[in-house]
Amino acid sequence: MKFSDIISKLEVTNYSLTQNPNNDPEITGMAAIDEATSGTLSYIEGAKFASFIAKTNASALILPQNEAMQAQAQERGIVWMATPEPRLLFAKAIALFYQPYTPTPEIHPTAVIHPTAKIGNDVYIGPHVVIQPGVEIGNGVIIHPNVVIYPGVKIGDRTILHANCTIEERSQIGADCVIHSGAVIGGEGFGFVPTRTGWYKMEQSGYVVLEDRVDIGCNTTIDRPSVGETRVGYDTKIDNLVQIAHGCQIGAGCAIAAQTGMAGGVKLGNRVILAGQVGIANQAKMGDGSTASAQTGILHDVKPGEVVSGTPAIPHKMYLKIAALYSRLPDMYQAFRQSQRQLEEEGKR
């Protein structure tokens, strides 16, 4: 595919092009900037990666709107397209060369489907899938091998369930969701009441709701509560190995990275970003547009738009100032001890 054909298929409106329109290389694939070979298209997102332009073997680049970077590519004879969102354009270009595996609609003979289940049109149900009573499956749903769907579950149109995931009782999965292998949606919340003789198990009668366009990574667990619902909002993306406890309410457009854990009743607003290994304590709230950096421990509420780091969480700028002092602490302590000794000696005179 010619570079010019890629640009036209991306339907970009706000962009600029290389000053050599006669150079229109054949693009055979996509590659990271440091792994690109002749015939591949790559991208650079920001100025801190500009040094790669001098070393890359890519035939074409998607660049930010940075004249210095564009001139550098021009000098090397690399054709380019500049846009305010190079990573987004690169992601769209990948889709021109790669299409994920989509099985032909069918129901495999080894699938076990209860007669009360309702199955939509153009559905694929793979080997050894188990679909229990009262389940409703929308149109165009793909259910890969060994998936287990408990009673009363509802799954919206075009949702994809990858192999070996489990959707437990009464869960409601929206349209265009993707649930990856090993995930468990709607498992029992951690509900036990202490008594004088041990723990009394509180039945978890609630359910989980995933709104439309939610992505759930491998081995992530989202628990149902004792009453009510656990909810994940529209277009939220959740990475692998995330634990979301009973009764959590997650807003729309959030991004949650791997190994994050939320205790019961946590509430996230819209567009909240959690980096890896964030821990959030019971009932804590994070406002719209707030962010927690990696390994943050959130014990109290976070204001809308606030960026926090550390344990317990503090404003990110304050955390950076404190972190800058860590390496100086031994010298500061020695200086303090020396001053202390001098004062003690002066006190003896």
Curated annotation (Swiss-Prot):
CDD domains: LbH_LpxD. The active site is at H246. InterPro entries: Hexapep, LpxD, Trimer_LpxA-like_sf, UDP_GlcNAc_AcTrfase_non-rep. It is an enzyme of class 2 (transferase). It catalyses: a UDP-3-O-[(3R)-3-hydroxyacyl]-alpha-D-glucosamine + a (3R)-hydroxyacyl-[ACP] = a UDP-2-N,3-O-bis[(3R)-3-hydroxyacyl]-alpha-D-glucosamine + holo-[ACP] + H(+). GO terms for molecular function: N-acyltransferase activity; structural constituent of carboxysome shell. Keywords: Acyltransferase, Lipid A biosynthesis, Lipid biosynthesis, Lipid metabolism, Repeat, Transferase. Pathway: Bacterial outer membrane biogenesis; LPS lipid A biosynthesis. Its EC number is 2.3.1.191. GO terms for biological process: lipid A biosynthetic process. Homotrimer. PANTHER family: UDP-3-O-ACYLGLUCOSAMINE N-ACYLTRANSFERASE, UDP-3-O-ACYLGLUCOSAMINE N-ACYLTRANSFERASE 1, MITOCHONDRIAL-RELATED. Catalyzes the N-acylation of UDP-3-O-acylglucosamine using 3-hydroxyacyl-ACP as the acyl donor. Is involved in the biosynthesis of lipid A, a phosphorylated glycolipid that anchors the lipopolysaccharide to the outer membrane of the cell. Belongs to the transferase hexapeptide repeat family. LpxD subfamily. This is UDP-3-O-acylglucosamine N-acyltransferase. It comes from Trichormus variabilis (strain ATCC 29413 / PCC 7937) (Anabaena variabilis). The gene is lpxD.
